A protein has these predicted regions:
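Bacterial N-terminal signal peptides
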Residues: 9-19
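Aromatic- and acidic-residue-enriched carbohydrate-binding clefts of CAZyme catalytic domains
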Residues: 44, 81-93, 98, 102, ...
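Non-membrane alpha-helical structural segments and their capping/turn regions in soluble enzymes
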Residues: 60, 64, 96-103, 150-157, ...
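Aromatic-lined substrate-binding rim segments of carbohydrate-active enzymes
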Residues: 63-131, 201-212
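N-terminal carbohydrate-binding accessory modules
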Residues: 23-77, 107
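Hydrophobic faces of well-ordered beta-strands that scaffold small-molecule active sites
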Residues: 49-51, 78-80, 116-120, 179-183, ...
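Active-site neighborhood of glycoside hydrolase catalytic domains
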Residues: 152-217
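Bacterial N-terminal signal peptides that target proteins for export
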Residues: 1-11
Length: 217
């Protein structure tokens, strides 16, 4: 009963965030939507069995090995946080190469028959310094993190645009492995600013995730 309640909550979040996402797809792509008490992958019931893998914590030569281990354990999906403070360690200096090549991580997942759920934050928790928020945000002494602070939102939008450049072409609608994208992370335990969450949703959409299903939890 509890599991059903959790699923209904997630489906409600999907309905509120996704709108008509997943209704159309490129000819070489697919769809992923929330159906009646189940997820639908290309129109067929699909149970998400997800493993959490943090690419900064795994040396790049071992990425594929860890993905294969997850598949061997019966998983079909990898959840992927995007750690803002490793991709933009200095303001306006973005790095998505080498150990930070999240697009390659997703391609390795697809190569091994795994789907991907992207969780770009901006806050990701993950027992990671500042939950992934860059230290340099604090140079602005009056900044309000995870609120509609103009400077914070401007920086989030810039970062998400870079994430979109890397990952939006890899959604299932474009033939890639990404089936869902999370909006913020565990925000309900932090605040109740619904307009802020809606603004983050809009930024995620604007960054290129126009068709993929969004969710919040």
């Amino acid at each position: 009963m509890q599991k059903l309640s959790i699923f209904r909550t997630l489906v409600l979040s999907l309905a509120l965030l996704a709108g008509s996402a997943g209704a159309s797809a490129a000819t070489d792509g697919g769809t992923f939507t929330a159906g009646n008490k189940t997820f639908l992958l290309n129109g067929k019931p699909f149970v998400v069995k997800a493993a959490e893998l943090h690419y900064p914590r795994i040396p790049r030569p071992y990425w594929e090995h860890r993905i294969k281990m997850c598949k061997a354990l019966g998983m079909n999906t990898v959840c992927l946080y995007v750690f803002w403070n490793i991709h933009e360690q200095r303001e306006d200096q973005f790095d998505f190469t080498g150990q930070n090549d999240i697009a390659e991580f997703c391609r390795l997942a697809q190569k091994n028959g795994m789907y991907v759920i992207v969780r770009p934050g901006p806050y990701v928790c993950a027992e990671w310094e500042m939950g992934g928020l860059p230290w340099w945000l604090l140079k602005k002494k009056d900044i309000r993190l995870r609120e509609q602070d103009p400077y914070f939102m401007k920086r989030v939008e810039k970062f998400m645009a870079k994430v979109g450049e890397q990952l939006a072409p890899l959604t299932i609608q474009h033939g890639g492995p990404i089936i869902m994208v999370q909006v913020e992370n565990e925000y309900g335990s932090y605040g109740e600013d619904k307009p802020y969450v809606a603004a983050i949703r809009d930024i995620v959409r604007k960054s290129g995730f126009t068709d993929v299903t969004l969710f919040q939890c």
